């Protein structure tokens, strides 16, 4: 029985954790053993779970990162115990997801991975692997990662460092360790990310592209929405413009406020994922909803919206676009990262970052010339079903193992 071990900051929690869970289910259905090693935050899983480190370890890692810019360089004991566990379960494939997040020591881990001889897969969900500090550089319009990170302009962003800038050292450490594993295969979850990886120090590693997908049995066109209007005080007689983010940092909150001042009274903007502070800042005509894990409510919100707006300034491949389309709602997005890759001209509009006038024109276009709901949904069913994507990973595992023997 082959064994798959995945490593991620979460287990069956959040988008990346659910991707690992879905891949694990496919492995199990094919007679494999599936294990997920995680740092923190989990939901019950069909895979076996192994927790890396402790809350105290995470706190120490976080504090030293804030002061010394040591992100990924602490958690030595936790990482060595993980390696002992890996030796015990002896996996055939090791699949990395997000290894940042104050829970792993990447030099210790990659020094071990370089010696195992096992096939290693690493899905890049952001840009952290090839920068000296940040997970995203689009907003800062920084391209130092192409040559050598130093004098970081984003030291105050995740993983925040308030005292030292060690971006040059971090860049060189990552380059050394991440390029030292002979059997490492990279996966980029967007074509945009794949193109940037090809310009980084990771360019010589095997690199594939697998888009993220969604569960189209969970996100569909929902007609049973009457109770939703009452629950969130959404007016029945308004056109709905929807925006969703789990974290609104650089996701266009201010742009939505500006848009509200330009929109006619026939529209109501609904924003999901807001903090208490943001809720207090909302003008008339904007309904705010806190972050919710209620998938049924999210499905209904997508379904009642006339248009889904993704005014993100920094993104890789947002699955909210997929969720909206699966629920029959056209998407308008800024041209940020891979955000446009799930759209076609028939079901979405791509506009320049910050172009609120173009956003306004696109909203009016879709409001008065609705896109057929089934056209939006069928595009996602055909191209971005999560089951399809998980099977692509499993096919890759089998290919790597066949060449490894």
Stretches with model-predicted labels:
Residues 187, 235-251, 257-260:
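Conserved donor-binding/catalytic core segment of Leloir-type glycosyltransferases
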Residues 273-296:
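Nucleotide-activated donor-binding/catalytic signature segment of Leloir-type glycosyltransferases, i.e.
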Residues 280, 335-350:
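Short acidic/histidine- and often glycine-rich active-site loop of Leloir-type glycosyltransferases
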Residues 300-305:
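Short alpha-helical donor nucleotide-sugar binding micro-motif in glycosyltransferases
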Residues 313:
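Aromatic "clamp/platform" in nucleotide-sugar-dependent glycosyltransferases that forms part
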Residues 330-333:
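Short hydrophobic beta-strand element within catalytic cores of glycosyltransferases
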Residues 345-355, 364-370:
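Conserved acidic donor-binding segment of nucleotide-sugar-dependent glycosyltransferases
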Residues 370-395:
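A short, well-ordered alpha-helix in the C-terminal region of glycosyltransferases
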């Amino acid at each position: 029985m082959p064994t798959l071990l995945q490593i991620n900051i979460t287990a069956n929690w959040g988008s990346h954790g659910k991707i690992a869970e879905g891949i694990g289910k496919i492995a199990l259905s094919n007679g494999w053993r599936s294990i997920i090693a995680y740092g923190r935050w989990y939901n019950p899983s069909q895979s076996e779970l192994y927790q890396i480190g402790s809350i105290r370890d995470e706190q120490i890692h976080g504090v030293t990162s804030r002061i010394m810019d040591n992100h990924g360089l602490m958690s030595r004991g936790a990482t060595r115990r993980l390696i002992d566990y890996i030796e015990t379960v002896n996996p055939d494939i090791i699949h990395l997801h997000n290894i940042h997040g104050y829970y792993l020591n990447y030099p210790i881990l990659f020094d071990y991975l370089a010696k195992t001889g096992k096939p290693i897969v690493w899905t890049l969900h952001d840009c952290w692997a090839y920068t000296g500090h940040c997970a995203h550089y689009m907003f800062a319009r920084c391209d130092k990662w192409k040559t050598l990170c130093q004098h970081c302009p984003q030291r105050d962003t995740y993983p925040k460092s308030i005292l030292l800038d060690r971006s040059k050292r971090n860049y060189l450490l990552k380059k050394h360790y991440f390029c030292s594993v002979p059997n490492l295969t990279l996966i980029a979850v967007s074509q945009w990310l794949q193109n940037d990886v090809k310009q980084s120090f990771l360019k010589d590693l095997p690199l594939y592209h697998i888009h993220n997908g969604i569960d189209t049995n969970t996100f569909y066109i929902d007609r049973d929405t009457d109770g939703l209007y009452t629950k969130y005080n959404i007016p029945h007689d308004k056109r709905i413009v929807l925006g969703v983010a789990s974290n609104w940092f650089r996701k266009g909150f201010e742009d939505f406020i500006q848009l509200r001042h330009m929109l006619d009274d026939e529209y109501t903007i609904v924003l999901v994922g807001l903090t208490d502070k943001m809720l207090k800042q909302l003008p008339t005509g904007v309904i705010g909803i806190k972050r919710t894990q209620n998938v049924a409510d999210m499905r209904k919100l997508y379904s009642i919206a006339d248009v889904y707006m993704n005014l993100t300034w920094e993104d890789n491949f947002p699955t909210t676009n997929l969720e909206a389309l699966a629920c029959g709602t056209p998407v308008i997005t800024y041209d940020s990262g891979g955000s446009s890759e799930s759209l076609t001209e028939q079901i979405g509009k791509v506009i320049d970052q910050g172009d609120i006038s173009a956003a306004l024109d696109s909203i009016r276009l879709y409001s008065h010339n609705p896109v057929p709901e089934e056209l939006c949904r069928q595009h996602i069913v055909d191209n971005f079903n999560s089951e399809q994507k998980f099977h692509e990973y499993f096919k890759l595992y089998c290919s790597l193992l066949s060449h490894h023997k």
